[in-house]
Amino acid sequence: MNVESSTLIALKRQVAAMERRAPVGKAVRVATGHGDIDSALGGGIARGRLHEIFAAEQGDAGSATGFAGMLSIRLGGGVVWLREESAVRGGGHLHGPGLVEIGVDPTRLLLGFLPDPLSVLRAAADVVRCAGVGVAVIELHRDLKVLDLTASRRLALAAEESGVAALLLRIAATPVASAADTRWAVRSCASQPLPANAPGHPTFDLELLRQRGRGADGRWQVEWNREQAVFTSPTPSGAVVAVPARRPAAAPIPLRRAG
């Protein structure tokens, strides 16, 4: 049995366990908490749809990853995060303490590592069809021939049928034609320090590049409020602290992985 097959078997077994849990709510759209963004989206980010998240530049990869994690929290349910093994070798593991810091529950996060982009897409098609999954994050790096319009349509149709939110996280990649409901560009931004000069809330520059069926787009600077698990506008302040594009290594959080 090859690595891809054994990983998929383990992944399907653990996803099946997710499906036995309480189902995700039936709301079609979930508010982000940021009024202007929710207005542009017609009420919020849609479940049962494919959404693309692009790191605007290579140095914005951490911010784009954080945004995907935060959207997963807003959308609710168990999260299956699929990555290429080369992403781990090239950029390291997901920063467990950082995910916990923004509010991700490690017990509701399942990581799947696949040997190549095609394997990631095959696994994603299976995961997105599982109605018991809340969110599938499909992380792919570089421009890829296998991720064409047809491949994105498969993911979009699977999401529509199951109600799972599929977040296609693209690092060091150029946007191309796709069946995604929304497409976002994420840029790193400075955060406002909290009282006593404590580190501020994560802050991003978000740009809605396109939205299927709606002409609205826009660009906003937003903060993530972990306590309320919502996006808000930054509180004006005279001082800012820079948010590093990449965090230093830290002790790993025990995140579940398939395989």
Where do the model's predicted regions map?
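Conserved inter-motif catalytic segment of the P-loop NTP-binding fold
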Residues: 77-134, 139
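Helical mechanochemical/support elements of P-loop NTPase systems and associated helical scaffolds
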Residues: 33, 64, 91, 120, ...
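Hydrophobic/aromatic beta-strand patches that form the interior of the parallel beta-sheet core
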Residues: 51, 80-82, 110-112, 167, ...
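Short, glycine/serine-rich, charged loops/turns that create anion-binding
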Residues: 58, 86, 173
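Phosphate-binding/switch region of NTP-binding enzymes
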Residues: 168-239, 247-248
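Detector for small/aliphatic-rich hydrophobic stretches
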Residues: 1-81, 92, 98-107, 214, ...
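Conserved RecA-like P-loop NTPase ATPase core
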Residues: 37, 53, 109, 136, ...
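P-loop NTPase motor core
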Residues: 113-190
